[in-house]
């Protein structure tokens, strides 16, 4: 059967290849590594994707064309090219490519991250900025961040008294997960009978795993579908989606049926805000939110929010332990500015005094952007980038990791040196194309303020209350990376906390 299918599809594939080559010969396309028939450059993409693309760009140039099966992908690895994509041609490049996984998990474009550019994406982004990520709303969740950090400190003190080694990676993922769960659902993570820490971590891992490009995305419909069917990809994708959807149904239904379970009755959470908007729009003729939009938004907030904030804190702590001079300077600033805290917990307003801590976070984001390739974009029209023709419906990837380590932009780029940002106007909010941890333009991450507030307070608590050392058996910290869309430390960060008196 498979041999018959091969002979049936072969003429179709060869015809498509010929037509593509004829069109490409008339354009000034970006440089590209040598390709193989049908698979294109797929055979050259080994190892961590962002590092592989970094190496290919060093060899072929900062605007690099790759052919993945039957789709074109352009990789951007310079500040100048990134500015053209994200600023000059932002409008022509502000939609997302439609893939099997993104269509499934976004419920066909009903979320913030993957909605195609248009009325839906604009309304969802406006809704998120007003109701969830505005300065006022971020500040309203301050009590959650302070309470959850206080709980983390108490648990770490128990471990410190016993001189136990702590898995700080797990601790920080749980901290951020708890903060976002409370802000979203109005109850503590450990209070929901349908949710547990291990299940959420497992689902987050599974979603990332099935979220990459599949054969259906890069080969003609029949061929790609058949390859995914044989490999079990369709079945796995559906299974993970059902698990995520079931989890969301449980927490949303519980929220609606048992409002008394909420930790803080008098303070609206994110679901409250979305439901209120849905009710208000019932009589409105314009764009209407549905439960699918609600699920898509929650999924974006939780999956993206937990990963990025926790990963940033983990890399920051790893770099600080690896660089004791920087650690000492950060702790001295924190302990001098805050003074002695007896019974009361650290408050978020304390962060405003800590300029060096902010530099540490900025340097961490330069070296370790949590999503090194950002989220993919797709051109909606023919454009030119650095003089090269970029056809419509080309996937664009901006390698923020590569730009952040470019020796033409940064002195000693591999060195962790927060002082490089003293009196430096560069920021991480999409205005400086030398570092783009959250992207830029119309598709910039809307949750920057919430994420940075979480990271600042988390690191402040870790560095104020504790000194840190490696476990006896460890001589150094393994900084090897792992992951797909987001990049974590491959080996969990295990440290011994010592209570600072």
UniProtKB/Swiss-Prot annotation:
The keyword Membrane applies. Keywords: Heme, Iron, Membrane, Metal-binding, Monooxygenase, Oxidoreductase, Transmembrane, Transmembrane helix. GO terms for molecular function: heme binding; iron ion binding; monooxygenase activity; oxidoreductase activity, acting on paired donors, with incorporation or reduction of molecular oxygen. Its cofactor is heme. Its EC number is 1.14.-.-. Pfam families: p450 (PF00067). The chain crosses the membrane at residues 2-22. Its main location: membrane. It is an enzyme of class 1 (oxidoreductase). Signal peptide: none annotated. It is found in: Membrane. It is a single-pass membrane protein. Belongs to the cytochrome P450 family. This is Cytochrome P450 71B3. It comes from Arabidopsis thaliana. The lineage of its organism: Eukaryota, Viridiplantae, Streptophyta, Embryophyta, Tracheophyta. The gene is CYP71B3.
């Amino acid at each position: 059967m498979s041999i018959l299918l091969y002979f049936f599809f072969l003429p179709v594939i060869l015809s498509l290849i010929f037509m593509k080559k004829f069109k490409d010969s008339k354009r000034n396309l970006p440089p590209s590594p040598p390709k193989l028939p049908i698979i294109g450059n797929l055979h050259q993409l080994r190892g961590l994707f962002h590092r592989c693309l970094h190496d290919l760009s060093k060899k072929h140039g900062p605007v690099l064309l790759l052919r993945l099966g039957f789709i074109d992908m352009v990789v951007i690895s310079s500040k100048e090219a990134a500015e053209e994509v994200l600023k000059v041609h932002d409008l022509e490049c502000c939609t997302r490519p439609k893939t099997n996984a993104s269509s499934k998990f976004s419920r066909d474009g009903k979320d913030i991250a993957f909605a195609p550019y248009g009325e839906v994406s604009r309304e969802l982004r406006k809704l998120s900025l007003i109701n969830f990520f505005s300065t006022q709303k971020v500040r309203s969740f301050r009590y959650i961040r302070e309470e959850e950090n206080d709980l983390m400190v108490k648990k770490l003190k128990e471990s410190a008294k016993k001189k136990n080694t702590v898995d700080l990676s797990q601790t920080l993922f749980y901290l951020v997960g708890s903060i976002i769960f409370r802000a979203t659902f109005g109850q503590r993570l450990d209070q929901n009978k349908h949710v547990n820490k291990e299940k959420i971590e497992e689902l987050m891992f599974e979603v990332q795993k099935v979220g990459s490009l599949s054969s259906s995305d890069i080969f003609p419909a029949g061929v790609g579908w058949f390859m995914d069917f044989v490999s079990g990809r369709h079945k796995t994708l559906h299974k993970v989606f059902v698990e995520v959807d079931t989890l969301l149904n449980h927490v949303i239904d519980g929220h609606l049926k048992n409002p008394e379970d909420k930790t803080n009755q008098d303070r609206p959470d994110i679901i409250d805000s979305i439901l209120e908007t849905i009710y208000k729009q019932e009589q409105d003729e314009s764009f209407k939110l549905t439960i699918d939009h609600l699920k898509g938004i929650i999924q974006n907030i939780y999956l993206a929010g937990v990963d990025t904030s926790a990963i940033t804190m983990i890399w920051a702590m790893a770099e600080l332990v690896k660089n004791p001079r920087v650690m000492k300077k950060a702790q001295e600033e924190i302990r001098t500015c805050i003074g002695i805290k007896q019974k009361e917990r650290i408050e978020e307003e304390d962060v405003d005094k800590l300029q060096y801590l902010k530099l540490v976070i900025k340097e961490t984001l330069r070296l370790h952007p949590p999503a090194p390739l950002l989220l993919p974009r797709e051109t909606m029209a023919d454009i030119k980038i650095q003089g090269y023709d970029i056809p419509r419906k080309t996937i664009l990837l901006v390698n923020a990791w590569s730009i952040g380590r470019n020796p033409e932009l940064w002195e000693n780029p591999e060195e962790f040196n927060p002082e490089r940002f003293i009196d430096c106007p560069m920021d991480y909010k999409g205005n400086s194309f030398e570092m783009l941890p959250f992207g830029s333009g119309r598709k910039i991450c809307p949750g920057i303020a919430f994420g940075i507030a979480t990271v600042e307070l988390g690191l402040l608590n870790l560095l104020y209350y504790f000194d840190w050392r490696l476990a006896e058996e460890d001589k150094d910290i393994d900084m090897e990376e792992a992951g797909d869309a987001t990049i974590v430390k491959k080996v969990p960060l295990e440290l011994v906390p010592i209570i600072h008196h």
